[in-house]
Amino acid sequence: LPKWLDKVEDTSFKYSGISWWRAPLQWTATTNAKYYGKYIRSAYVIKSGDGSQTATWKIPVPEAGQYELYYHVFKDDELRWNDRLQGEYHFRVAYDSEMEDAYINLRKANEGWEQLGTYYFSADTVRVMLTDECKLRSVTADAVKIVKR
């Protein structure tokens, strides 16, 4: 039977065009010139919600020590056009047997790398979760990194 079936080529795109005023209901990969990336500047975007949807990064820690944790901030047009609008991203940082909350105030943050905090990580994997809980219309999961102190 398989030899009689036509091979169907997957022509779907990995990235979708999105608009911040009508954000997708599930995490959707998209591109933007202000996202982090060397060749492809991409991120995931979702409509703001109650915090039940998360984007998770798993970061390998090469050796135990103090690390600074950074998130790459992207500010969409919603913040640029409305000066009174406030919004912050809610992160959960899981390492060893700890779970800590971290926040970035998007009104005060600069675009680009913004520090989430300083942590002592053992040589293992750190999980950083960004929730969809936000007062803005959408949440953008761009990039995270750790830098040893």
Segments the model singles out, each with a brief description of its role:
Residues 1-149:
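Extracytoplasmic
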